Each structure stands twice: as C-alpha cells, then as structure tokens.
Amino acid sequence: DASLLNQLYNLGLDYERKRQYNKAVAVFKYVVAHDPGFSDVQERLQHNREVSEQFVLGNNKSSTPSDGTLIISNSGVQKPMIGRYVIDSELGRGAMGMVYLGHDPKIGRSVAIKTMSLSQEFEGDKLADVKERFFREAETAGRLHHPNIVTIFDVGEDQDLSYIAMDYLKGENLMAYAKSESLLPAQETFDVIVQAAEALDYAHNEKVVHRDIKPANMIYDRDNGIVKVTDFGVACLTDTSKTKTGTILGSPSYMSPEQLAGAKVDGRSDLFSLGVTLYQMLTGELPFIADSLASLMYKIANEKHPDIRMFRPDLPSCVSQVINKALHKELDRRFQSGSQMAKALIRCRERLSKKH
C-alpha cells in the first residue's frame, strides 16, 4: 500500500544519505516495481545506480575494496560526501587511510580530510578504546591555535570511517628535503626546525604530545618560509599501537628510546624525534639504521648516532652539540622544552651565518 511504499522510499533516501548506494538501489527497485510513478523514485533509482558504479566507500559489504577508499570519477554524477564535506579529489594515502581534498559547502572553505577505517585495523574492546582515544585527542588537538600548527576544524565519524577535517595547506612535506640530493641550505633547515620546536613548545604547554614527529608530518611552504606541524591527534593511534594483524604503526626510526619501550612519553620524546628530523634534513641520512626492527630498537636505546660532522664537516661544532643533546638517551639530559631547543638552534644558526 501507499504507506508501505512511502516508508520504503524514505528508507531508500536514508541509505542514499549514508552512501549505501547498493542498498538504496534495491529498495528503489522494489518501489518502482510496485508503483513506477511514485514520487521521483525513477530518478533516484537511476542516480543511485550511477553512483554505486562510480564510488566505493568504507566497509560496504556489497562493494569492494573495503579499505576506506573512495573511488572518485569525473563523470557528471553527484560527488560523495564525508560528514558535511563534499569530496573533490584524492590527495594521498596515509598509514591508516586516505587523505582527500574537500570543501564545506556551507561556507565554501577548502579542507584536507584524513580518513581512517579504524575497524579495519582494530577490533572488539581495542577498537572501542582506540576510537575513544582518537576522538578525545583529536578534539584536544583542535583547540591548538599556533601559526606553525595545522588547524583542525572538525572530527567525526561517518559509517565505518573516522575523519579529521583540517586546513588545506600549500607546500610539500619535509621528506622532499630530507634526501641527500635535495637538501635545503643549512640555515633554511635551521629556520624550519626552529618553527617546529616553537610549535611543539606551545603544544606541550597545552598538555598535548604529538608522538609522531617526522619530516612527513611537517608541511613546508617554501614561498613564504612557513612550516606547519600536522597530524596532532592522529598520532595517538600510531604510538606503537599494534593492529589486529600485529603490525606496529608509526615510524620507529624517529621514535625515542622510551617510546619504543612502550613507556609513557612527554614532550621530550617529541624533541628527540625533532632531533632525528634535523639530522636527516642536514645529511639525507637517518641517525639510526638497522636491518630489522629489533636491531633498530636496540641501536636507538643503546648506541650513539654517528657524529653529524662525519657527513657535514662544513657545519660548525654547535650543530653537533644541538643534535647530541636532542638525541640523548637520558631524558634529563635532553632539551627540556621546545623553547630551549629553539633558542639553541637560533644561537647556532647565527654561528652558521658567520661561517658562510
């Protein structure tokens, strides 16, 4: 009867809104079979058929792949949405999901949207714990306002995807300048790391530890000389968390000894990671290299890194001193704050400019 068809039609709209296009198609087909002239059901059916052929999102059991990927085509069908954001294009793939360029249709603001299909990586109580931690930390990170920290606008969940909407930045991540053939001039590298140290000082004073500082998590716009630290609030998931496949997420090469040991970390762990980043950006080499994770963990915990002047004899001795202090195994002998590290870098940069 008409009331049943109306209920089914509304169910189809609900599936469409949730991007469960195959289910919407099945419902609208049923309505068409019983009343081809019902409302705009013919157009809805056609639209959802087109969309279901073009887009795959999240863990939709009747579609593949199921890794939280949107397949975006350039045909004339309506663009997919995550939360309130329209997805425009793909920016890249992160450790746990995709990053998209999107916009907020209400205010027209462009945003980068990082998605994570947490249910693909964790299960049961662990999944609930990770989700709670993710939302708590992302909301805390959203309260950070600093010229060298990427602004987080929104965090949410849509179907099986958790997402963070953040400022869309021009520039490249620092990995572009961490290879021996594409290093920045030393003074410019110091300017970049000073900005990052000041950003971390601010975050640590706000009781936020990043836990995944590395070149890939800093975006540098060389045209205006500004670097921004990104992925605050995401790193809580990569803090040596093991997924259900047993994989350790995160970047062990940049982790402090205490982080690799699974101990509670504070801001000084981030400063160790920033020291590793500085070393790599001055030499194109990581300070600790090994053939296996176990061997790498042993080296970071117990062995001294090669003196940076083995690679860069042109640099003044203060560079070695800054690196050695940042990479000290003992917490109390490391830089105690981002501000302290920034000041040491600025002093050393002045000696650098006298030398060159």
Q: What residue spans do the PLM features occupy?
A:
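Conserved short submotifs of the Hanks-type protein kinase catalytic core
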Residues: 159-173, 177
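Protein kinase catalytic-loop region centered on the HRD/HxD motif
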Residues: 198-208
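Activation-segment/catalytic-loop signature of the eukaryotic protein kinase fold
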Residues: 155
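Protein kinase glycine-rich loop
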Residues: 88-95, 99
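Activation segment signature within eukaryotic-like protein kinase domains
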Residues: 192-193
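AlphaC helix of the eukaryotic protein kinase fold
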Residues: 117-143
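C-terminal lobe helix-coil module of Hanks-type protein kinase domains
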Residues: 200, 219, 251-354
